[in-house]
Amino acid sequence: MSSADKNLSVFSTDDLPDLTGTKFAIVVAEWNSEVTEKLFAGAYQTLIQYGASAENIIRGNVPGSFELTLATQWYASNAQVDAVIALGVVIQGDTKHNDYINHAVAQGITQVNLNTSKPVIFGVLTPNTMEQALERAGGIHGNKGDEAAMTAIKMIGLKPKIDQLKG
């Protein structure tokens, strides 16, 4: 939850997993590419910074945010992909179109998480204006692509800890 005076793209990096051999898919909506390219750059750089290798980061492009759901399902269903990051931007318009898209994508990505038992990260911005979107793609509110990548890393690290509880 971002506020006017807070940049949330600062994370605790305690206890992060070793990402050697971990494969990520980043699915990027082409609509509003001025923003989504910055989100992708942030996510990619964060994965590299914390130990992922470039050859283990796969990029897939989709026309718009609505298509993120199916593409994330395809990637998450692939046994070789460990986590999927969905990046998009749906800006408020004059109609309720954005409400329908945002709800469908959020619900769809939630369902992909549950169906595949893999981290599928919702990195879709839902701003009122392009200015707000840019503020969250490397501007005063940080880069939500960074946050999506860190969320994927932390979720990958959590699963083995939970599995150990089984004994």
Tell me the role of every PLM-derived stretch.
Residues 33, 37, 41, 62-66, ...:
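Electropositive phosphate-/nucleotide-binding environments in soluble metabolic enzymes
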Residues 25, 67, 82-84, 118-124:
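Structural motif
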Residues 1-23, 165-166:
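SAM-dependent methyltransferases
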Residues 48-53, 80, 115-116:
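Short helix-capping segments at alpha-helix termini
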Residues 12-62:
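Glycine-rich phosphate/diphosphate-binding loop of Rossmann-like nucleotide-binding domains
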Residues 30-31, 62, 89-90, 125-129:
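Short, ordered loop/turn segments at secondary-structure junctions
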Residues 3, 22, 98-99, 103-167:
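C-terminal binding/interaction regions
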Residues 67-109, 165-167:
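Glycine-rich phosphate-binding loop
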